[in-house]
Swiss-Prot record:
GO CC aspect terms: plasma membrane
Any Gene Ontology biological process: heme O biosynthetic process
Pfam families, alphabetized: UbiA
Chief place where the protein resides: membrane
Catalytic activities: heme b + (2E,6E)-farnesyl diphosphate + H2O = Fe(II)-heme o + diphosphate
Organism: Legionella pneumophila subsp. pneumophila (strain Philadelphia 1 / ATCC 33152 / DSM 7513)
Protein name listed in UniProt: Protoheme IX farnesyltransferase
Lineage: Bacteria, Pseudomonadati, Pseudomonadota, Gammaproteobacteria, Legionellales
Source organism superkingdom: Bacteria
Keyword Transmembrane: yes
PROSITE patterns: UBIA (PS00943)
Listed EC numbers: 2.5.1.141
Transmembrane segments: 24-44, 48-68, 96-116, 118-138, 145-165, 172-192, 224-244, 245-265, 268-288
The keyword Isomerase is assigned to this record: no
Length: 294
């Protein structure tokens, strides 16, 4: 394995940035910001925003680094991930572990000292849920790994909300529910596109265990459910007409992609659906934010 020869390969600072999965973390931090602003009747202080984003971002980077560490053997098999820093051997197991521990402790310390203890606790639970429960167990144990593990990935807007209010509110849980419902169609579309790689790595993703067509049906059904769930902020008067129109347009467009995916055998459509799902979530939360102030 390449990881055995890590000491022979040069380590670049960009490898440590890659360990943190920056693109994933940036999308996550967008949902944190939206959670913060939705929790506040007015504007949120820049100081609180800075410490919240830095603390949660460092913890998210720590969880991502642990994911690289635990999945290094799987990553070395899959074409999409075989050149990741730990899998390829540019960063050793020991280096990755120390990096994850240090930035994780830094993030939690910032949240405890400058935000609040509730947010720090929830962030820690989320870190353990993703890095420990999902990465360490669920990913290899069940085809519902994404569904169950999605709870950890859906937490960021709740963390942003509690950073401002220092309490759990039902409205914040609606934001969690949106991301929780979005997660399966998002990841299953990628799993269809990377079906052979997951099969070779012996990861029990839904297309591998139940077949591609069954997975397409589940993507379709979850996308319908997501469209319904995404309207709940308007139903409970958490948001207004701007958000409603945005959610409807985005939801219908996502449903069009799910429909197209169900009736085609072209792998590229699965990747296009996956990419749109990222744009969908980003724009949906932008609509929430815009609607809140306008």
């Amino acid at each position: 394995m390449r990881t055995e020869y890590a000491a022979r390969l040069p380590v670049d600072w960009r490898d440590y940035v890659e360990l943190c999965k920056p693109r994933v973390v940036l999308l996550m931090l967008l949902t944190v910001i939206v959670g913060m602003y939705l929790a506040a009747p007015g504007w949120v202080s820049l100081r609180l925003i800075a410490f919240t984003l830095l603390g949660i971002g460092l913890c998210a980077g720590s969880a991502a680094a642990i994911n690289h560490l635990v999945d290094r053997h799987i990553d070395s098999i899959m074409a999409r991930t075989k050149k990741r820093p730990v899998a390829y051997g540019r960063v050793s197991v020991k280096q990755a572990l120390w990096f994850a521990v240090i930035i994780g402790l830094m993030g939690l310390s910032l949240l405890i000292l400058f935000v609040n203890q509730l947010t720090a606790l929830l962030t820690f639970v989320t870190l353990i849920g993703y890095a420990g429960v999902y990465t360490g167990y669920l990913k290899r144990a069940t085809s519902q790994n994404i569904v169950i593990g999605g709870l950890a990935g859906a937490a960021p807007p709740l963390l942003g909300w509690t950073a401002v209010t220092d309490q759990l509110d039902p409205q914040a849980l609606l934001l969690v529910l949106i991301i929780f419902t979005w997660t399966p169609p998002h990841f299953w579309a990628l799993a269809i596109y990377r079906y052979k790689e997951y099969q070779d790595a012996e990861i029990p993703m839904l297309p591998v265990t139940h077949g591609i067509q069954f997975t397409k049906l589940n993507i379709y059904l979850y996308t319908v459910l997501l469209l319904v769930v995404s309207l709940l902020p308007f139903v409970v008067s958490m948001s207004g007409w701007i958000y409603l129109l945005g959610a409807l347009v985005l939801g219908i467009r996502f449903l069009v992609w799910a429909h197209k995916l169900y009736f085609t055998d072209k792998p590229v459509v699965a990747m296009q659906t996956f990419r749109f799902s990222i744009l969908y979530l980003m724009l949906l939360f932008v609509f929430l934010l815009v609607d809140h102030y306008f």
